[in-house]
Amino acid sequence: MVNIISCLTAQELKPNNHYNLAQKELIKRGYGMFIHFGLNTFAELEWSDGSIPVDTYNPTNLNCDQWVKVASEAGFRYVLLITKHHDGFCLWDSKYTDYDVMASPVKRDIVKEVSDACKKYGLQFAIYYSLWDRHEKSYKSKNFNDYITYMSNQLKELLTNYGSICEVWFDGGWDKPVKDWQLPKIYSMIKKIQPKCAVGVNHTISYPDDLRKSVLPDSMVIDNKYTFQYFPSDFRLWDPKIAHKLDKKRYLYQGESYYLPFEHTLCISKAWTWFQKEKNLPVRSLDELEELFYWCTDNNNTLVINIPPDKTGNIREYEANAIMELAKRIGIKKDKPLPKNGELLSLNSEVVPSSVFQENIQLYGGKYATDGGMQTLWRAADTIATLTIMLPQKPFNKISIFEACEQHVA
């Protein structure tokens, strides 16, 4: 017991006003490819309830090497792989369940193949693991410690059998009270096995007066105002929202301040499709991808873009081409720092709109065109409208306009 306590103490997250080692490495890599693949791919679903038969998983031409090769050629620094989604289906050979790839018609360890391919192409390897498990019986046990043991055992498999893991991305925490997850214990276990690994939990930050109400990234513009919902964490997540241009990094836990960068998650698809569908879906334009790249990798934050394989087990050529074209356009080079955008001259500039919808300045005022928030907007009352922006007397060579659309930014 003394040794265990010693290990836990050594791996505590310390209050700080600047990034720690794991956060420094997270910020440095900056740009990753998200890969959603599993039972949902073959069921045409985004989420499933853990009841889909395991033999539904049946890729016809599985090629994990192709996934990572695309990531490498597109300039990604790391691959973030779904190892287990909310349905509980595992993409590796787990000793603790038969709801995994080894019980399917295609008995190949996806986690191993992706990890090996990352080593081959010189990329870092990260894993997504859903806390919520809709298949595992112990999840519904009266003694939830049974599930914590199950989860801990699976995480140990992932952290010890597949080489270096740069990041663990947890999801689904909303399904249970925060304390049930025993996150300090899980965090310390991860750090003991993989000390440089960054750990994050989706919906990381909450309001001080309501610890189960997560704060949207657009509101995270004041240091030390909001508190951890999931402590400890090395970085913030709010999938798939986008941080404010004035995003702040310091958040509170028990009166102490901690530095937390933000990791963005986007889909290559305009339809916000995480698991690939039978029908080919349009991808975001290069213009949109370029501006989102610059926005999301700015200010010591990071970006992962989801490019999911289809039922054959391959990334579709048109999606691979789109992300590689982005790398060419903005000049992403392997072993070189990520490209940076120029100064945003219009940020918080004075504006004069020709009209405001319903004269509701609080919701749709012209100031929201330049406030740096992706969730706020100027909305005119007229079909044809103008917005005058008072810019500083500095040269510029690009104008970027984000249009508010119903399902995604454009």
Predicted regions and their residues:
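Mature catalytic domains of secreted/periplasmic carbohydrate-active enzymes
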Residues: T9-D371, W378, T388-P392, S400-C405, ...
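Bacterial Sec-dependent N-terminal signal peptides
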Residues: M1-Q11
